[in-house]
Amino acid sequence: MIKEAQDLAAAAFGADHTFFSIQGTSGAIMTMVMSVCGPGDKILVPRNVHKSVMSAIIFSGAKPIFMHPEIDPKLGISHGITIQSVKKALEEHSDAKGLLVINPTYFGFAADLEQIVQLAHSYDIPVLVDEAHGVHIHFHDELPMSAMQAGADMAATSV
């Protein structure tokens, strides 16, 4: 029954596979990070990542390479990372084992995920997406592109 439900969820989200997590999105995010990083490995992450990302980095022994998101000057909230910040990070750390993107951010801002995925893949770097606040975006054409639609390698969503 669980496998059937996971298969149905994968089909709904356009994913090859879906695995349910009893630890919520935090557990899934930690699994994603620890599946690509080991001791001393670099992972590119936005500075405003969820604490589960930092926990996974600590547990795996990886080294975070921070990309600073744009900050809204009027509201003081973070928008997300840009293609330019990702490009700079990839040029300086082409040996990174992964790139993590928040899509959408905790304030609802979406990255140009398709371009970011294409750029990271040109460096043979997998893209992991924290999509905890974007489970709905896959299901409407007028919403930003979901991680799976953009070609990301893994995504953690919350239902």
Regions found by a protein language model. Name each.
Residues 1-27:
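Conserved N-terminal alpha-helix of the aminotransferase class I/II PLP-enzyme fold
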Residues 11-12, 27-159:
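Conserved PLP-enzyme active-site core in the AAT-like
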